[in-house]
Amino acid sequence: MDYKREPLEDVEIDVLKQACGSFEESLIINVLLETGMRVSELAKLRKEQISWQRDCITTVGKGGKRRVIPMSKKTRFYLSEYFVNKEKIEWGSRWIQKIVKRIAEKAQILKKVSPHVLRHTFAVCYLHKGGNVRALQEILGH
């Protein structure tokens, strides 16, 4: 299948995760890969949007669409650690984009890597694991 934005291969995902040099970098890479969130949604994420009981994140995306994103155990770990003494993510979209690019360069991944490529990678992985197309559209807000 040809993609406009080339998703990362499994080995590239592993190398990208290993290249993270701090908790914050690991949070950014893992949450984007595990949820398919837009960079702007991560940058605006607030503690009150997370349902720890239902393992999901409620976000408002493009066009004011409200949607619920399932939260994996890994995402839950990173967000619960981050939000111990914070109420919201304290990074801007541009900063997150720069961090993702820097980690990809450190990992020596040759293809273009951006938060949107991580979102696309999430979608492709979801479908390869047998995920439902309609459910994926709901998660991504399409």
Task: Show where each model-derived region lies.
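Conserved catalytic core of the tyrosine transesterase superfamily
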Residues: 1-142
